Amino acid sequence: MAKDILIHQIIEVLERAGFMVSNQCNIRPRSFDLAARQGNTLLFCKVLYNIDGLNEETAREMKSLAKYLNGYPILIGAKTRDQLLEDSVVYMRYDIPALSIQTLYDYFVENVPPLVSAAPGGLYVSIDGDVLKEARMNVSMSLGALASELGVSRRTISKYEEGQMDASIDIVLHLEEILDMALAKSIDILRSFEKELDPANVKEEAHEMKTPPNDNILNLIYTLGYDVLSTNQAPFKAVSKDTSSTFLTGVSEYSNAMVKRAHLMSSISNVIETQSVFIIEGKSRYKFVEDTVLIERDELNTIADSDDLDTLIHERAKRHKEE
């Protein structure tokens, strides 16, 4: 299946689920292919025919963007290694959930969450430990008796009941048959895999936000009072944020390639619900391209602080909407 067909199918699924979907990111390199929003749920979607094609650098940027913009990274594909992705199964690549189009459809359109996760060694299911313990006690079955029936240790049953261990599909089916009770816990794709925040990582990320960017223009924006998250693979060069506003930030001379990026940034910013700004090195022919505000470098040099820049951006955006 060609990637373009895959992306087209994904857009259809997301739109059917009520998502607003951005234009496809067709500029290389790209850390994500689509942005999509439904209410408070913002997705950064990476599409790869083989999900093993995701590399660590791209995954890191996806996760940084998602965290910075209160969204979720998600990987959608068709195969892994030499086999097709199983439906109703969630795979993980660099802590990003990966799934098939059918699983995407079931989750967002049919509201049917998957039950199975892929891990080294096979496919596993999370057991609702409280339900398991209650069901076992209701039939007056000891840990030892249930363990013997399953062919596992008493300690394993205890771990199932304490929620400390997932089980194979066969074990869960056998358990449900013995106890006549549904025990599998569904997977909230967007939230089940959120990691507990490591204080060291939080401190490191906070330090990065306080460190001036290497790019001269981004550094200038930083000195005005913005936190600036630089990107290497997104259609924009950074995301700039202060206490009252957030804007996707591009930096370039005025050119046809810049105009193309500005159109794409407009589409993405509309989905993300931020402003989109391009800082132009040299002269600009226009004040905006679609919904992306264009500001010449010389104009930026006259700005005193973030309030002044916010005012300029909002006034120029308002003028565009009135025209």
UniProtKB/Swiss-Prot annotation:
Gene3D superfamilies (UniProt xref): lambda repressor-like DNA-binding domains
InterPro entries reported for this sequence: Arc_TR_HTH (IPR020886), Cro/C1-type_HTH (IPR001387), Lambda_DNA-bd_dom_sf (IPR010982)
GO MF annotation terms: DNA binding; DNA-binding transcription factor activity
Pfam families linked to this entry: HTH_3
HTH cro/C1-type domain: residues covered: 132-190
Organism whose genome encodes this protein: Methanococcoides burtonii (strain DSM 6242 / NBRC 107633 / OCM 468 / ACE-M)
Keyword Transcription regulation: yes
Protein name per Swiss-Prot or TrEMBL: Putative HTH-type transcriptional regulatory protein Mbur_1811
Keywords, in A-Z order: DNA-binding, Transcription, Transcription regulation
DNA-binding region: 143-162
